[in-house]
């Protein structure tokens, strides 16, 4: 099992949800995620701090999935970054084990 943490600018949050839903439909898997809004931080683009200087914020998606999904989500992220240059979208994958 894999955990994928996806951080996107709130400006493209709805597009990520749309693309992820399309992917889940294509792969015939249930579209599951946890979404955390108002995430502050700085990556490869301008800071997203939700203040007067850096007003934008990020959204964090946490997805637990089968081992074959990270490669497909990687392609989804490449699509987002190509369409929205400079907005900020990154994904990180790790191995996880369900407890209980």
Residue ranges with predicted function:
Residues 1-100:
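Positively charged, small/polar-rich N-terminal and surface patches that mediate targeting and assembly
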């Amino acid at each position: 099992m894999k955990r994928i943490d996806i951080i996107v600018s709130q400006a493209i949050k709805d597009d990520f949800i749309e693309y992820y839903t399309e992917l889940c439909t294509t792969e015939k898997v249930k579209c599951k995620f946890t979404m955390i809004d108002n995430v502050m931080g700085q990556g490869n683009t301008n800071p997203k701090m939700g203040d007067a200087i850096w007003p934008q914020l990020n959204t964090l998606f946490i997805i637990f999935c089968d081992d074959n999904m990270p490669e497909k989500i990687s392609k989804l992220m490449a699509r987002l970054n190509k369409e929205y240059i400079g907005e900020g979208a990154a994904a990180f994958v790790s191995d996880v084990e369900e407890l209980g």
